[in-house]
Amino acid sequence: MIEFLLLMLAVFFVWKIFDQNVAETRIAVILPESGDKRWDALINGMKQSAAENNAHMIICNTEEIDGPEVEREFIREQKDNDIDGFIIYPAPGHETENMLKKECGNNPYLLIADSLAVKEGETASPTIQPDYREIGRRLGEQLKTKKQKIGIIADWKMSEAVQAEISGLTEALEGSGSEISWCIYRRKEQNITERMKEETKADALVILDPGVLEEFGEQAEHGKYKGAELYGVGYSLKTVALLDKGNIQGLVVPDGYEIGYKSVKEIAEKIEHKFYKMKGYTTEYQIFSKKDFSMDDDLERFLYSYE
């Protein structure tokens, strides 16, 4: 009996030794402007999932990624570092999908936060992202309560996500008397305020670029912006605070934490089990309106998805 117990203990300790020495899965994460605070919740979700899935994340240090050529260089660099798989925010451009398939090769990759345009009959890469059309529609529902002229400021690249948001916004405004007067697509190093002077006066701005929304909200907070009411998509706690102060009137917050968590879980599963078919997911988002916002009640709801 004692010999049997000693044998079982020996087996247990050997198992623990080998279990602790299992190599971590190495996952490269490629995001545009990777140090930007809009990725905070997403990266928090990734870190939590990585800890649960024995994965090590390498977040590439990037600036703006304005096309597939730039993204290709980051992929090649990480392949030289013996990466097992990639999580990628796809660069704008019709050639991105083909580039990813070619460059990633046998390394699995998963797209996040923005899908790629796919021709009829082709199969898209799995993507984890919110329903951008529905986000646009919900913003439109906040705006259609009164007749007004609306201006749109979108990300500097005309992504599939932005197109879907604008489509949803347009659908929601149909028959309301409100209309979209103009749309500006941000360009690199462009002064948006100066660019807006070329357009007709708007009663409300829908800002689909989180960085620009926060910038305009901060200007309103300090009395430097006194134009149209601000609505848009944001990720940061600062943006929610600006809503609470009345500098922003309507806000949609995608659940970046969920995107990050599920993306690592899926890619880790694929790396461990070669024949596993990765799934795409439609993730959650929060909707806030200044007129019924409560910092006590709604902040907790935001923080739940943020952290």
Language-model region placement:
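Hydrophobic membrane-insertion alpha-helices, especially the h-region
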Residues: 1-14
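Short beta-strand segments enriched in small/hydrophobic residues
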Residues: 17-42, 59, 126, 149-158
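Short, solvent-exposed amphipathic alpha-helices that sit
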Residues: 38-53, 135-139, 160-179, 215
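Hydrophobic alpha-helical
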Residues: 86-105, 169, 185-240
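Flexible loop/hinge segments that line or gate small-molecule binding clefts
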Residues: 95-134, 236-244
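Venus flytrap/periplasmic-binding-protein-like
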Residues: 114-120, 210-211, 222-251, 288-292
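Hydrophobic alpha-helical segments within soluble ligand-binding/sensing domains
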Residues: 126-151, 235, 239, 255-272
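Hinge/cleft segment of the Venus flytrap/periplasmic-binding protein
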Residues: 262-307
